[in-house]
Amino acid sequence: MAILGLGTDIVEIARIEAVIARSGERLARRVLSDNEWEIWKTHHQPVRFLAKRFAVKEAAAKAFGTGIRNGLAFNQFEVFNDELGKPRLRLWGEALKLAEKLGVANMHVTLADERHYACATVIIES
């Protein structure tokens, strides 16, 4: 196994809150997968939930070396928790095609949040 990419992102939670206040659900619709959207709609801390997903997806896009462009979209990266509660990534569409092209065999996700910030790191391996 070799490390193919590493990405880190930090999000100011108040910034996400301000965008939601201005534009309603538009940001959530753009960032979240369908499964994440269903969770977000009833989540007890929707702003924090969205901020953490945003951080992971930005970190993943950086790990892939592309950013969000050329057909990649935030909602093609889905954050879920395994049976132990560990954050994991599931890919869809162009993100999945890119992972296959690069030979990605494993993705590691770490996620942390405090009162004002959410931070994520993603490592992709062959």
Curated annotation (Swiss-Prot):
Recorded catalytic activity of this chain's protein: apo-[ACP] + CoA = holo-[ACP] + adenosine 3',5'-bisphosphate + H(+)
Subcellular location: Cytoplasm
GO CC annotation, single: cytoplasm
Biological process per Gene Ontology, one example term: fatty acid biosynthetic process
Protein EC: 2.7.8.7
UniProt cofactor(s): Mg(2+)
Keywords linked to the UniProt accession: Cytoplasm, Fatty acid biosynthesis, Fatty acid metabolism, Lipid biosynthesis, Lipid metabolism, Magnesium, Metal-binding, Transferase
Keyword Lipid biosynthesis: yes
Cleaved signal peptide residues: none
Superkingdom in the source lineage: Bacteria
Binding site for Mg(2+): D9, E58
Alphabetical list of Pfam families matching this protein: ACPS
InterPro entries according to UniProt: 4-PPantetheinyl_Trfase_dom, 4-PPantetheinyl_Trfase_dom_sf, ACPS, Ppantetheine-prot_Trfase_dom
GO MF, one annotated term: magnesium ion binding
Similarity section: Belongs to the P-Pant transferase superfamily. AcpS family.
HAMAP family: AcpS
Task performed by this protein: Transfers the 4'-phosphopantetheine moiety from coenzyme A to the 'Ser-36' of acyl-carrier-protein.
Binding partners and assembly: Homodimer.
Protein name per the record: Holo-[acyl-carrier-protein] synthase
Organism of this sequence: Escherichia coli O157:H7
Gene: acpS
